[in-house]
Amino acid sequence: MKLVIAEKPSVAQSLAAVIGATARKDGYLEGNGWRVSWCVGHLAGLADADSYDPKYAKWRYDDLPILPEHWQMVVGKDKKKQFDILKKLMNAPDVTEVVNACDAGREGELIFRSVYELAGCQKPMKRLWISSMEDSAIREGFANLCPGADYDGLRDAALCRAKADWLVGINATRLFSVLYHRTLNIGRVMSPTLALIVQREAEIDTFKPVPFYTVALELPGLTVSGERMADKAAAEQLKEACQGAAATIKKVECKEKSEKPPALYDLTTLQRDANRLLGFTAQQTLDYLQSLYEKKLCTYPRTDSRYLTGDMADSLPVLVNLVANAMPFRKGIAITCDPQTVINDKKVTDHHAVIPTRNLKDADLSALPAGEKAVLELVALRLLCAVAQPHIYSETVVIAACAGGEFTAKGKTVKHPGWKALEDAYRAKMKDAEPKKEGAEKALPELTEGQTLSVSAAIVKEGKSSPPQHFTEDTLLSAMETAGKDDMPEDAERKGLGTPATRAGILEKLVSAGFLERKKNRKTVQLLPSHDAVSLITVLPEQLQSPLLTAEWEYRLGEIERGQLAPEEFLDGISTMLKDLVGTYQVIKGTEYLFTPPREVVGKCPRCGGEVAELQKGFFCQNDSCKFAIWKNNKWWAAKKKQPTKAVVSALLNDGRVRVTGLYSEKTGKTYDATVVLEDDGQYANFKLEFDQRKGGSR
């Protein structure tokens, strides 16, 4: 009997159906000499700090850094049942071999190995490594199982990544939280990513636009423009000199150009396009693509390759043809297929590029959720474009002279639309399709050098230099991918911050931690740092916010994966860095109050409708332009020997009144009960008393 362990139940069912394990049991499937079970994501993970010593349950500076000598793995309480099932299956006497069928990547390897080792399993181990959930790919994968030991480097890299994240997260988070009296989540990749965003905002805030001026001349059939000028008076002078004059054509240059088709998608480029064209977050795109993979409609999602392998060349034309027939936007467009444009064995590591599968032929695409359908169409479009003919056009550049100045015009004539015909057809069907820029592909009239043309109009156009753009998920993913790239070795397989598999999760963590806000601006969603994010990057030392250092770590993890670096050497370097950080870092003078304490909202402001929150000295509207406040040392309340509590103020804001007991009377020296009513006159928050007339009110 052979045991197969998948990463999740849905994948296990697909595998079991192909190999004939169809009988349902408690936590697994069985049949045809196979048992198929599953993990539920990470069943086991690194233990919390207090597992090593109970004193670590409390965050104290004196306990740092926390550097475990012997790492512990623990099973999550909510996942113990499935772990126990796997442990029993692994150690069953009739099981002769265990097949790791978790996702074919770092995390999938770690998920399986953690369970395998915690279960104390000693059975021979094989690895199922597939890039598609199609039945044919599954059958081929089981026919070519690899020895599990071939992936020891992948396991080592995954475990080192987890330990590095633990070390930096636990120690840096505790250090800065203790020093600044606020929980500040710090991550090995998260913090440098945040630093990119904060730095961009600083560049935008300090940017000073520089005005410039260009002179444009209207000639018969075309408009020519001069170079940018810093002096407006000089531009006006040139305009006047050109007005009513004649322009001489100095140069006419026509070149035929070719624009190659785009490469296929890896995960990051797909996430970027899905954000730019569809408005999806990186996490949404990954989730949709993962579902399409499990539905056997797309290949493996977490890939960093944009090419296919040579053994796929012969079957590619058939796939391209059936994909084209399934996509409505390609109607009327001739489909070509040049496999060599997408074949490159040297640029495929663990998995090839993301492409649709042949199951598309029989799939009911209308039954797919809208998000999945949109991502599938994008993947299909890219495949059709990538194997299509180049986009060929002629570009004409005209240089004219007038009144001592030079003026230029460019024109474009499409000779063969090639792959762009598909892209244009796809975009034309989009609801928010961007209109083509007027004149962007306008052809110029026939002109000859030495020809003179009359200037019918001359104008001065004023512009300003543009500030850097706020990050979107599209542009941030690009920045993460290339961070530290120039300083990495040319042959480095992984450069940048994070990996295709982890970048979406990093962005979501930044949002959930309150460091990052998604703000819609017209058709895009900008990523903006919060006040606390700016404060955090202000106090973080360079080694925790440097994209270069983190990119270097990613490169080192790649070396571990390839067996070129010992895991201990990598982790020793991080431990040394943390010891130095704890031993030398001091609170930066003037930054003690950068981090505002969390403010609990108690109600709505009666003046502006904003949120009223409790601070140390009272309850204040959070809108900067509104001055509504209820002070805790308010004289009216002090005279009655009471202080407005959170519950009292909440009732006043929500209901306008609140019943209060034990109010003190200065006249009688006794206490009484009454209803306090809030009366706000727009300048001050006033209070009055109301008494129950039926019962009276003794003072």
Please provide the spans of the model-predicted regions:
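Active-site phosphate-binding and catalytic loops of NTP-dependent enzymes
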Residues: 23-28, 123, 148-153, 174-178, ...
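Intrinsically disordered, low-complexity regulatory segments
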Residues: 1-162, 467
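C-terminal or mid-to-C-terminal helical accessory/interaction module adjacent to the motor/catalytic core
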Residues: 93, 135-219, 254-258
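Conserved short loop/turn motifs at secondary-structure junctions
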Residues: 1-3, 101-104, 181-183, 254-263, ...
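Amphipathic alpha-helical transducer elements in NTP-driven molecular machines
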Residues: 9-16, 33-36, 40, 76-87, ...
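Metal- or metallocofactor-binding catalytic centers and their adjacent structured scaffolds
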Residues: 233-265, 271
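Basic, low-complexity terminal or inter-domain segments flanking catalytic cores
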Residues: 2-3, 79, 90, 118, ...
